[in-house]
Amino acid sequence: MKANIHPAYAETTVVCGCGNTFQTRSTKPGGRIVVEVCSQCHPFYTGKQKILDSGGRVARFEKRYGKRKVGVDQVAAYPEQNNK
């Protein structure tokens, strides 16, 4: 490797918006990185994640057309289709 071309890789303190701090190594000058979200406060890691239905499309479809029953009732209702 060439000498004096690589950036300095030093200890850095990462500070989260929730107050959590931890040490890592980085090439960013200043020795301090401020982040908005970390593993201590992110909903995915804390288990408080909410799953959002995109507009309720499935629920709206089922409300309009209803759930169809597939089974003995439909087979008995259309005997001509069963003879094919």
UniProtKB/Swiss-Prot annotation:
Keywords: Metal-binding, Ribonucleoprotein, Ribosomal protein, RNA-binding, rRNA-binding, Zinc
GO cellular component: ribonucleoprotein complex; ribosome
Alphabetized InterPro entries for the sequence: Ribosomal_bL28/bL31-like_sf (IPR034704), Ribosomal_bL31 (IPR002150), Ribosomal_bL31_A (IPR027491), Ribosomal_bL31_sf (IPR042105)
Protein task: Binds the 23S rRNA.
Gene that this polypeptide is encoded by: rpmE
Family of the protein in this entry: Belongs to the bacterial ribosomal protein bL31 family. Type A subfamily.
Gene Ontology biological process terms, A to Z: translation
Residues given in the record as Zn(2+) binding sites: C16, C18, C38, C41
PROSITE patterns membership: RIBOSOMAL_L31
Complex and partners: Part of the 50S ribosomal subunit.
Cofactor(s) named in the record: Zn(2+)
PANTHER family: 50S RIBOSOMAL PROTEIN L31, CHLOROPLASTIC (PTHR33280), LARGE RIBOSOMAL SUBUNIT PROTEIN BL31C (PTHR33280:SF1)
GO MF annotations, alphabetized: metal ion binding; rRNA binding; structural constituent of ribosome
Protein name according to UniProt: Large ribosomal subunit protein bL31
Cofactor binding note from Swiss-Prot or TrEMBL: Binds 1 zinc ion per subunit.
Pfam family name, one: Ribosomal_L31
NCBIfam families: L31 (TIGR00105), PRK00019.1 (NF000612), PRK00528.1 (NF001809)
